[in-house]
Amino acid sequence: MTTSTIDIGGKTVNRLGYGAMRITGQGVWGPPKDHDEAIRVLRRAVELGVTFIDTADSYGPYVSEDLIREALHDGSGYGDVVIATKGGLTRSGPNVWPPLGRPEYLRQCILMSMRRLGVEQIDLWQLHRIDPNTPREETFGEIKTFLDEGLAKQFGLSEVTVEEIEAAKAAGLPIAAVQNMYNVGNRSAEDVVDYCDAHGITFIPWFPVNAGKLANPGGPLDEVAKQHDGATTSQLALAWLLRRSPVIAPIPGTSSVAHLEENMKAEELELSDDEFQTLADAA
């Protein structure tokens, strides 16, 4: 089995985590259609061994963080579970996500996330997007200030280039994690993955099971699945990511307990060298 742990937020966690975007309403706006199922999903994830959950203040907005606290906070914290969150986006409607990197807004983001999650320090706080309309030195400067104040144990970036990672490091920010879209079907962030691998930075791929045409009937994922006793294409997509690099920590999301249980079985899959390369080449 692929080595399944990684250090995030000062704790050793299982690499196959859970992304808590889909426990909100349609368009990642408002409450979930089934509140009780959302709570069940979160609790079942932990029962299945998930110790890394990723969310953001913009999911809902605020809904995902509130649900995580309701489902998992034990009165003093989250035990062995690392809760990562993000800030730096505003919401003006379903599927609308304008970035805002003003220092005062980012400080509000992290302070309000701390309040909603019921913690005195965020395990991993990530800048959801770099705002092109705010000077980077202002954004990075404020983040460094609240990191120095101890508001977060670790810091990460989302949807960034290698150049932007280097710029953040040059501004004095210790980069513990990078979260970009990346999956077996979309490898546009390959250079960022390689950079993270070389520098020991956790890489968190979002949309990890979105394999595109590779998952079509008769496609590469489908053909490999036939060699693994009915494994699903989603499970294979996750297994491929876990094999791709030891710094990768996928965060598949779902609002269904059944789908969650299916995804978690990906850790049991072991791709052969030929299978891994077949899928790598197919993209």
Model-derived regions, located:
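Short, well-ordered coil/turn segments that N-cap beta-strands
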Residues: K11-L16, G49-T51, G77-V81, V119-D123, ...
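Beta/alpha (TIM)-barrel catalytic core signal, keyed to glycine-rich beta->alpha loops juxtaposed to Asp/Glu
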Residues: I130-A283
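N-terminal binding-site loop/beta-alpha segment at the start of enzyme catalytic domains
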Residues: M1-V81
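Active-site groove signature of glycoside hydrolases
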Residues: M114-N133
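A short acidic, helix-capping loop that chelates divalent metal ions and anchors anionic groups
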Residues: T24-V28, T90-V96, A215, H259-E262
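Acidic (Asp/Glu)-rich catalytic clusters
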Residues: G10, E70-V82, M114-G118, L147, ...
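Short, acidic/polar
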Residues: P31-A45, G101-L117, T161-E166
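Alpha-helix N-cap and loop-to-helix initiation/capping positions
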Residues: G30-E37, V63, L67, W97-Q108, ...
